[in-house]
Amino acid sequence: MEWHDGKHRCRWANPKNELYIRYHDEEWGKLVRDDAKLFEMLILECFQAGLSWECILNKREAFRAAFDEFDLDKVCGYDEAKEEALRTAPGIVHNRLKIHAAVTNARIFREIQNEYGSFDAYLIHWTGDAVIHETGKVSSPLSDAVSADLKKRGMKFAGTVIIYSYLQAVGRIESHEDGCFLGYKM
């Protein structure tokens, strides 16, 4: 598809949504090392389950406001009253199970940081610090293994498809389509 700026992009990028275009061009597939950003993306990916990523991306600023800018210490400290308040927070997904999972997953994220030194180091444990280049998949042996480990630790909404999408979003799996101006070049 030819875009207004002459660049070819992945087919999933909605040419009518400037926010989505910026996400594709500036964020998706770029290697993330910062644990704060890794945490934010993990929580957003979990909320995306059963919904479109575009829907979640359009609500990201509301999620940031509702979840204290994804401050891990604050989210780890959320109690039942805070979870209940999030069920009416403006602009976010109000699913009770996903809200509870976000708090649970924050605590497990912290446990992983304590075990590995950082969540980035945990991901490196699985990828050997390599970026995997593959397209046309929704899961892989890597996402199967990471998902199984996270679920064993107690994470919710962390199935292999969600984790594959997460690994793509944070640049551990590079999946820009052939012809995309950001695609892998050998």
For each of these PLM feature ranges, what is it?
Residues 1-186:
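HhH-family (HhH-GPD) DNA N-glycosylase catalytic core used in base-excision repair
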